[in-house]
């Protein structure tokens, strides 16, 4: 074997072993959480818009659909999460209707349909999600009419959306998961939700965007994973006054999250939708860990738990 061929062989072997290790690392449990986007309205090139997936076996349940959701799902599928293959995306849960959580909605509905998803999409969200859906589908009517009735001969059912406007309580249940929606406070939004997912091997609570919430403490109560939004007090201290007022009314400070986590007692706390500004991720973790001794990580796009 020539030296050049040996180098090529070793390079391919490293790639193969890396892929194998990734697949093994995500195959031990039935349930995985995949952070598809951990961003905020700030245009951070390293963080896609807010979205995460609960994947049980090979079935995915997506929470929120910020910009980039389908491409992040496609990337995760190549890392061994087969339930996130784009043509398998057909269940979506929306926490609230802020644009950073919903600008990927058309992408979520239309792109998997082009990629031959079978059957309709089930969407669960707050009051107003039906109107948003109807406007978006009307805007893209020429697109999907050509795809369905033109040379592609697309499946019309793949473009069908069943919209469910939620009320607090159990909003979805199948053989793999039960989903409980609960109200949280996010500024003046009339309806902003968090979710609790109960699967055969895990209980997972997703805060959505919110301030400190006793309801999250009740819903977690020792849950396996709590995924919670947060802002850095260090970064916050240098924000203009109008933004300080805004953030305090819409989001959860690191101090309040540490207090909440001490009472909720999750086995793992995952920081998400991190507002850091000119501070650092390390400083944010220091703020949490100074008052909370449980296991905590700062989530990044495509992290798997």
Question: What residue spans do the PLM features occupy?
Answer:
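Binuclear metal-dependent hydrolase catalytic cores
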Residues: 3, 20-205, 216, 283-305
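Hydrophobic alpha-helical segments, especially transmembrane helices
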Residues: 5-8, 274
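Bacterial N-terminal signal peptides
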Residues: 7-16
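Conserved Rossmann-like nucleotide-binding pocket used by diverse enzymes
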Residues: 15, 93, 206, 270
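Cap/insert and terminal regions of metallo-dependent hydrolase folds
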Residues: 21, 194, 201-203, 211-303
């Amino acid at each position: 074997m020539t030296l050049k061929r040996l180098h090529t062989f070793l390079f391919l072997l490293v790639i193969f072993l890396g892929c194998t290790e990734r697949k093994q690392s995500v195959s031990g449990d039935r349930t995985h959480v995949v952070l598809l986007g951990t961003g905020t309205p700030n245009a951070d090139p390293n963080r896609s818009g807010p979205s995460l997936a609960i994947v049980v076996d090979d079935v995915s349940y997506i929470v929120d659909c910020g910009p980039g959701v389908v491409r992040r799902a496609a990337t995760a599928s190549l890392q061994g999460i087969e339930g996130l293959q784009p043509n398998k995306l057909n269940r979506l849960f929306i926490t609230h209707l802020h644009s950073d959580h919903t600008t990927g909605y058309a992408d979520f509905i239309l792109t998997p349909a082009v990629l031959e998803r079978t059957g309709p999409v089930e969407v669960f969200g707050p009051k107003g999600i039906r109107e948003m859906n109807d406007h978006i589908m009307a805007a893209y009517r020429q697109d999907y009419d050509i795809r369905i009735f033109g040379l592609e001969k697309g499946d019309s059912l793949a473009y069908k959306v069943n919209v469910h406007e939620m009320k607090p309580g159990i909003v979805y249940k199948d053989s793999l998961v039960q989903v409980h929606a609960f109200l949280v406070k996010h500024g003046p939004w009339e309806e902003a939700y968090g979710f609790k997912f109960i699967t055969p091997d895990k209980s997972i609570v997703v805060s959505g965007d919110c301030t400190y919430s006793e309801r999250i403490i009740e819903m977690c109560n020792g849950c396996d994973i709590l995924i919670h939004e947060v802002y850095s007090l260090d970064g916050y201290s240098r924000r203009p006054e109008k933004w300080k007022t805004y953030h305090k009314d819409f989001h959860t400070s690191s101090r309040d999250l540490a207090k909440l986590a001490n009472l909720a007692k999750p086995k793992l706390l995952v920081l998400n939708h991190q507002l850091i500004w000119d501070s650092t991720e390390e400083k944010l973790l220091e703020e949490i860990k100074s008052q909370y001794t449980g296991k905590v990580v700062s989530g990044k796009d495509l992290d798997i738990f």
